[in-house]
UniProtKB/Swiss-Prot annotation:
This is Uridylate kinase. Coiled coil: none annotated. Inhibited by UTP. GO terms for cellular component: cytoplasm. The gene is pyrH. The keyword Repeat does not apply. One of its GO terms (biological process) is 'de novo' CTP biosynthetic process. It comes from Pyrococcus horikoshii (strain ATCC 700860 / DSM 12428 / JCM 9974 / NBRC 100139 / OT-3). ATP binds at G9, S10, G45, R49, T140, N141, Y146, D149. Belongs to the UMP kinase family. It catalyses: UMP + ATP = UDP + ADP. The lineage of its organism: Archaea, Methanobacteriati, Methanobacteriota, Thermococci, Thermococcales. Catalyzes the reversible phosphorylation of UMP to UDP.
C-alpha cells in the first residue's frame, strides 16, 4: 500500500518535544515502510499557535503568520526525520513532486506546511490525492471524529465509521463556532471527499500500533468515500 500519515504537531510536541513518543513512533513508521510506501506530513501544534499569537501583538498580517506557522511545522518535521534516521529523505520536503521522487528513491518523505492558507491537514489530503495513496492516517490529540468538539461538550459521541460527506458537514458546522478547533479542517475534509481516499482518524495511543491501524483495527474513526 501507499500510505500518507498526517501527524499533529501537538502529538509530537505537546509542551516540549516528547522524546519517548517520537522515538517509538519513528520505529513504528520505519517498520511500516519496509512493506509499504509511506509519506508523512507534520503539523505545528501548540508551539505554532503560541508563536502566531505573539506575532499578532505586532499587528502582522495573516499571510505573515501563516509563514511563521509553516516554519514551526518544518522544525517539527526535522525532529521526525532525525528519529527515522537513514530511512528518511534527509531534508524536509517542500512540494509534492519532491515527495514522489523521494518515494522512488525508497526514502520516506517528511513535509511540514507548504503555502499560506493551507493547514497541514489540507497538505496531507492533497499529498494523498497527488500520490494516489490507498490510505490517509490522521494522528491527532483527539481519538477520532466526534459529533461535537469533545473538549467543549462532554456528551459528544465518537463516530466509529462515517462517510466523507458527513465529515464535511460536521467539521464545517464546528468550524463556524468561535474558539473551536476541528479534528480535521474543512478544506482537508472536502479534499478527502473529492479524492475518495479511505481515511483513519486516530489518537496518540493507537499511533504506536500502526500495523494494526493500517488493517483497520483501532479505536478511532474510519472515513469511507
Amino acid at each position: 500500500m501507499r500510505i500518507v500519515f498526517d501527524i499533529g504537531g501537538s502529538v509530537l510536541v505537546p509542551e516540549k518535544p516528547d522524546v519517548d513518543f517520537i522515538t517509538k513512533l519513528g520505529y513504528e513508521l520505519t517498520k511500516i515502510s519496509e512493506d509499504h510506501e509511506i509519506a508523512i506530513v507534520v503539523g505545528g501544534g501548540k508551539v505554532a499557535r503560541e508563536y502566531i499569537e505573539v506575532a499578532s501583538k505586532f499587528n502582522t498580517n495573516e499571510t505573515f503568520k501563516d509563514y511563521l506557522g509553516i516554519q514551526i511545522t518544518r522544525a517539527n518535521a526535522m525532529l521526525l526525520i532525525a528519529a527515522l534516521k537513514e530511512r528518511a529523505y534527509p531534508q524536509v520536503v517542500s512540494d509534492f513532486w519532491e515527495a514522489w521522487k523521494a518515494i522512488q528513491l525508497k526514502k520516506i518523505p517528511v513535509m511540514g506546511g507548504t503555502h499560506p492558507g493551507h493547514t497541514t491537514d489540507a497538505v496531507s489530503a492533497l499529498l494523498a490525492e497527488f500520490l494516489s495513496a490507498d490510505l490517509l492516517v490522521v494522528i491527532t490529540n483527539v481519538d477520532g471524529v466526534y459529533t461535537e468538539d469533545p473538549k467543549k461538550n462532554p456528551n459528544a459521541k465518537k463516530i466509529p465509521k462515517m462517510k466523507a460527506k458527513d465529515l464535511v458537514d460536521i467539521v464545517s458546522r464546528e468550524a463556524g463556532k468561535a474558539g473551536v478547533s476541528t479534528v480535521i479542517d474543512p478544506l482537508a475534509a472536502k479534499i478527502i471527499m473529492r479524492s475518495g481516499i479511505k481515511t483513519y482518524v486516530i489518537g496518540k495511543e493507537d499511533a504506536l500500533k500502526l500495523f494494526d491501524v493500517i488493517k483497520g483495527n483501532h479505536n478511532g474513526t474510519i472515513i469511507e468515500p
